[in-house]
Each structure stands twice: as C-alpha cells, then as structure tokens.
C-alpha cells in the first residue's frame, strides 16, 4: 500500500488500535468468557547441572503437522499434562532447576485446592510468510510507540520479540531461548530491549520543546533475572507435541515501569471480535521498526491458532491479543491470548497450504504462567 490511499488506511488502523475505536457498528459487545480455572502448583524441585549455551538462535519454528493432524491427536492424560507443565528455571548465574507440578481444582466455597483426578489437558520448501499484499504496518512516532498497546512489545537480545505481561515479566516463545535440547547462545546474559527516544546532543525529557529534537528511537536494555520453560517444549521438541508448548516467561532484574498487557484464556475463534487477532513484533526485514498486523483466524486446535498474518523471523514470541468487553468492570480490555510461534507447511487434502501459528493460552497454561508471575494461585482465579 502506497500513496494517499495507503496512508489513509494506516491512519484508520492506528485510530482503531490506539484510540480503541471500532470501524464497525456492531450491536453487541464481544465479551470475555468466564472460565473455571485449574491450579498448577510446584510439588518438588531438583537442581540440574549447568547447561551448555551453544544452541543457535532459531527465529522461527516449522512443523508439518497441521490442523487436521493436531485435531487427530488425543489430549494429554493427567500424568502427561503434569509432565508437560513441569518446567525448567534458568538463573542469571547459569544454574538451573527442574520443578515437577501438580494439577488441582479449587473446591467449591473453599480456599483450599484438591487434586484433579483427570484433565483433558512438510515438505522442505521456501517459507512464505507474506500472504498476497504485505498487510503489515510499521509503527512510527513516539506518540504511538511509547503508548499502549504498542509499548508492551519488547525485543530480546537473541533476536525475537516479547510482550510485557506484568511489572517485571515478559512472555515470549520458548524457541527464542531454548532449542529443545539446550539453551540458546547468549541466554545466560539475556537482555530485553525497550524502545525510547534518542535525542540529539543537549536535548532530553518528554516536554514539547525537546520532542522536536528527537532523532530516532533506540533500545534501552534490562537484564533478565531468570527464565521458565515448560518441559512440554523440552521433552516434545523432537515431535509435534513441542509446538503446543512453545512459550516461556522471563523475569527482569528490575521493574520496567510501563503499562503491561494481562494474559487471558484464549476464547474459541468464533468468539473473537471479527474472528481476528492482532500482534506487533520486530520483524527482521524491517530492522529497528515495530511492525503491527491483524488478520483472521483460519483454523484452530485446542492448543494452536492457525492464521495468515504477514510475519517474518524476529516476530516470533510476539503476544497475540484481542480486545473484548469485561462485564464485571464494564470496560473494554485487551488481553494476550497466545504467543506467535512460527510457520507451517501442511498437506490440506493433497494440496500444500502454509500457515503462521500461535500457541493458545489454554486454562492450564494460564494457571501455569499466572503462577510464575504471581507466586500465589489465589491470584490466578480470573482468566
């Protein structure tokens, strides 16, 4: 899109995203559903040997198992779910631990938890991640970049994207820091980059007189204190189970002091506003630019969303979000419902079809990630 028509479309998109204005006069409000959430709690922790940090960073993940393949796979048993949701923690000094978890449901009317007896918990080719016309929008200007929701997107020193989900926490894709066997080179000194204005000499601050002297944006980096990666990714990376658990949480050494976006349980695709998802990331083909896009969900499984949002390596780890009505508070709210993972070529009725894939935040994954953030399951009762 170029020229005046393209500019007008871009301005309309930014108005809808930034000002929370809907381009459609819908007579109903898509509402965040209420879920009865499980509880994922640590049971035992084991110290592990220090890992090698020699894996090459992969900025995308590919799989030949598409929607029909995944739909034909049975949901994990209770014991399998516990194995997949157990997790590895890496600390800044290079030490690591493995934590086994239990899965519970909260007894009605009680503040205690009880054990849950059961839980339903291609072919090589050039990867095409741009579909038809490139529908991505580079976001320029500090008035947009430094304000919500775009300000929640951050860059990882390994080359991926992450999203601020709490005062000190960043959600990203597991493959950005771990290849399924060991940690990516540079993970021990992992940093998270925040866009901020770069001023010419003698300028500074956010007042109007100095804002005219803004030269460009730059990254300010904060070190990561520890990371959590589910064992479903580590155990399952050799097969298509791993794709379902391609997410990780990073804890920063200090608060970032920005507005963040909460996580939420992913509703069924038919309940999403317009059937669409949104995400912003640092695609490698537009270095230094934050790139926003939105598109329709084409298909879904219990753990994955299949879509054809235009994306390039570097966007992996972006938080996939939607904006829906929160009935108790009587307000609109955006929530992260998934993590952009990568690209798939799949066989659809004998014809090759490619998708970009996002990992859905299911009730179990929500309980796990929320506990990583809060450290108290009682604070994780609302998805």
From Swiss-Prot:
**GO cellular component labels:** extracellular region
Q: Which residues are glycosylated?
A: 93, 207
Q: Where in the cell is it found?
A: Secreted
Quote the PROSITE patterns the UniProt record gives: TRYPSIN_HIS
Provide the alphabetized UniProt keywords.
Disulfide bond, Glycoprotein, Hydrolase, Protease, Secreted, Serine protease, Signal
Please name the SUPFAM superfamilies in this protein's record. Trypsin-like serine proteases (SSF50494)
Which GO MF terms are attached to this record?
Answer: serine-type endopeptidase activity
Q: What is this protein called?
A: Serine protease 23
Organism equals Rattus norvegicus
Q: What is the lineage of its organism?
A: Eukaryota, Metazoa, Chordata, Craniata, Vertebrata
